């Protein structure tokens, strides 16, 4: 079984009820944080996972809302680890290493203060960055993480992840429009976690910059169509824009159900979904 927790279901627009985009995936004794949006560590604490309990950080792309708390995560993991400092594995698209280096540099004075003050902190936060666009990015203890390109242009490159364990599988799409590479990555998966925006509402915004968001994100219906093409068993919607207003969950769900007739999950931060083997309707390949 793979457990998915929607830590942050929000967007770049601050929302008192929703943290920034971030999802926790637990599989085979490992914990993966997918993206680290605004407020993620508060939601991690509520979900019972500490920064030093993560096996790896998976970044779908380098938009600010998906990496807003990267620096906080790196520093917190470092100062709350009281055993050997094992490097945090960070898997992301090309550009990730530069971003991580710049983030640590931004905290350079803080890191220096702490090393000077605490004798057991002798080096900056240890990280190992793996830049990938496709293929197997992680394979340990029966847990495999596969990567494939997505389409969030002009943001490029962007990637999605597929986590597999004991015949269960979950795909995390990140921000993307429908594309063949995501269809292939999601084929036969137990669940697809997908960003969803209400284009019918966003297109009404008076500001062109807001309307342009529709150009490189999937609508609720498009996310559902991707899930149906892939034959997944469960569609998990997240990263809602605009935020789902209280009482409007049924409307969002109904829009997805026009294209996807099976289990549809959406909700507030900390919504949890269990993905068991055998829930897909179309075997991979």
From Swiss-Prot:
Q: How is the cofactor bound?
A: Binds 2 Zn(2+) ions.
SUPFAM superfamilies, per database record: Metallo-hydrolase/oxidoreductase
Q: Which SMART domains match?
A: Lactamase_B
Reaction(s) catalysed by this chain, per the record, are: Endonucleolytic cleavage of RNA, removing extra 3' nucleotides from tRNA precursor, generating 3' termini of tRNAs. A 3'-hydroxy group is left at the tRNA terminus and a 5'-phosphoryl group is left at the trailer molecule
Q: Which domain of life is it from?
A: Bacteria
- Which GO molecular function, any one, fits this protein according to its record? 3'-tRNA processing endoribonuclease activity
**Annotated family:** Belongs to the RNase Z family.
Q: Entry's PANTHER family?
A: ZINC PHOSPHODIESTERASE ELAC PROTEIN 1
Q: What is this protein called?
A: Ribonuclease Z
């Amino acid at each position: 079984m793979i457990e998915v927790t929607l830590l942050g279901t929000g967007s770049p627009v601050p929302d008192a009820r929703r943290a920034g985009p971030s999802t926790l995936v637990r599989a085979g004794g490992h914990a993966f944080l997918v993206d680290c949006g605004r407020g993620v560590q508060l939601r991690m604490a509520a979900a019972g996972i500490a920064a030093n309990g993560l096996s790896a950080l998976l970044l779908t792309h380098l938009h600010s809302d998906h990496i807003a708390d990267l620096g906080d995560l790196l520093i917190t993991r470092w100062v709350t680890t009281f055993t050997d400092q094992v490097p945090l594995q960070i898997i992301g698209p090309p550009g990730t290493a530069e971003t991580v280096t710049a983030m640590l540099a931004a905290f350079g004075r803080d890191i220096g203060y702490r090393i000077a003050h605490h004798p057991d902190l002798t080096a900056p936060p240890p990280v190992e960055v793996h830049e990938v666009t496709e293929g197997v990015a992680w394979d340990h203890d029966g847990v495999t993480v596969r990567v494939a390109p997505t389409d969030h242009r002009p943001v490029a490159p962007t990637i999605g992840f597929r986590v597999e364990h004991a015949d269960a599988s979950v795909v995390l799409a990140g921000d993307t429009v429908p594309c063949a590479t995501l269809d292939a990555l999601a084929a036969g998966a137990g669940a697809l976690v997908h960003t969803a925006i209400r284009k019918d509402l966003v297109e009404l915004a008076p500001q062109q910059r807001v309307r342009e968001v529709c150009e490189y994100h999937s609508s609720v219906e498009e996310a559902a169509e991707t899930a149906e093409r892939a034959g997944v068993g469960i569609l998990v919607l997240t990263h809602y824009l605009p935020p789902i207003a209280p009482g409007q969950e049924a409307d969002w769900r109904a829009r997805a159900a026009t294209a996807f007739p099976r289990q549809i999950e959406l909700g507030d931060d900390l919504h949890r979904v269990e993905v068991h083997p055998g829930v897909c309707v179309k075997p991979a390949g």
